[in-house]
């Protein structure tokens, strides 16, 4: 009897239709008592994320969601907060939503949010 190699199995599977392949997967699941469902892996990944959320956040991102009516004032505040050049600050404001500051303390994030909001921008701290 000729021995079947992995390459032979792969070649055989490549020639199967999607319907036949789906039926084969179901039969294999029943025969070996396993599941090919991906949500199990997703649930395992979500676990640590929940634990991290429970810890107190120490670094915040200031996100410019929209420039509002007074775009020039917002550009000036962005330049002051980030020390970007005029063109870079304008591109950041035009490309909203964009992070203005990342990984800053809560106090610094709140101060930046206050300044941007006073200039007419829509801001979010994450």
UniProtKB/Swiss-Prot annotation:
Residue spans crossing the bilayer: none
Disulphide bridges, residue numbers: none
Top-level taxonomy: Bacteria, Pseudomonadati, Thermodesulfobacteriota, Desulfuromonadia, Geobacterales
Gene Ontology terms: biological process: translation
Record keywords, A-Z: Ribonucleoprotein, Ribosomal protein
GO (cellular component) term, any one: cytosolic large ribosomal subunit
Record Pfam families: Ribosomal_L12, Ribosomal_L12_N
GO molecular function: mRNA binding; structural constituent of ribosome
Superkingdom of this protein's organism: Bacteria
Subunit field text: Homodimer. Part of the ribosomal stalk of the 50S ribosomal subunit. Forms a multimeric L10(L12)X complex, where L10 forms an elongated spine to which 2 to 4 L12 dimers bind in a sequential fashion. Binds GTP-bound translation factors.
Role summary: Forms part of the ribosomal stalk which helps the ribosome interact with GTP-bound translation factors. Is thus essential for accurate translation.
Keyword Ribonucleoprotein: yes
UniProt similarity note: Belongs to the bacterial ribosomal protein bL12 family.
Cross-referenced InterPro entries: Ribosomal_bL12, Ribosomal_bL12_C, Ribosomal_bL12_C/ClpS-like, Ribosomal_bL12_oligo, Ribosomal_bL12_oligo_N_sf
Biased composition (Basic and acidic residues): 104-116
Annotated protein name in UniProt: Large ribosomal subunit protein bL12
UniProt region (Disordered), positions on chain: 97-126
């Amino acid at each position: 009897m000729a021995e079947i190699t992995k390459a032979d199995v792969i070649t055989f599977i490549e020639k199967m239709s999607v319907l036949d392949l789906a039926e084969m997967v179901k039969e294999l699941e029943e025969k070996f008592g396993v599941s090919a469902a991906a949500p199990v892996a997703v649930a395992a990944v979500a676990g640590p994320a929940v634990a991290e959320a429970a810890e107190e956040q120490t670094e915040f991102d200031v996100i410019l969601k929209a420039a509002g009516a007074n775009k020039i004032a917002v550009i000036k505040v962005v330049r002051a907060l980030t020390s970007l050049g005029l063109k870079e600050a304008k591109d950041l404001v035009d490309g909203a939503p964009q992070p203005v500051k990342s990984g800053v303390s809560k106090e610094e994030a709140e101060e930046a949010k206050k300044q941007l909001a006073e200039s007419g921008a829509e801001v979010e701290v994450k």
